[in-house]
Design a protein with these regions (language model features):
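PLP-dependent amino-acid enzyme catalytic core
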Residues: 1-107
Length: 107
């Protein structure tokens, strides 16, 4: 979509577009179709930029800045997060999630 239309879409919508394009080629069906996006490119910025350019910044805010520089409107919620203090930085493996949360809740 980016190469043809210079329009940036999220990863979920890109799957839908690919399925539709494959269907059109296989069936010859030229029926007018409307594709609705299911998310913003800002939801998966690293994946979106990697798909377009083959690489992407490691930092999510750097990815957001890159999307913005491409003309993709930045959601106000993302812009407001930049520079804010991180309140919770606890990270755990998914198989330890219940145990970790119980320990955290006891504090």
């Amino acid at each position: 979509m980016w190469e043809k239309e210079h329009y940036c879409i999220d990863t979920h919508t890109s799957v839908g577009c690919a399925v539709y394009e494959n269907y059109k080629k296989a069936s010859g069906d030229g029926t007018f179709t409307v594709m609705l996006s299911t998310a913003s490119p800002y939801k998966f910025p690293h994946s979106v930029l990697s798909a377009i350019f083959g690489t992407a910044p490691a930092d999510e805010f750097d990815c957001a800045d890159k999307l913005k520089s491409m003309g993709v409107e930045e959601p106000v919620q993302i812009a407001e997060l930049k520079g804010k203090k991180v309140l919770h930085s606890l990270v755990c493996d998914k198989d330890k999630m219940a145990e970790t949360m119980l320990t955290w809740a006891e504090k």
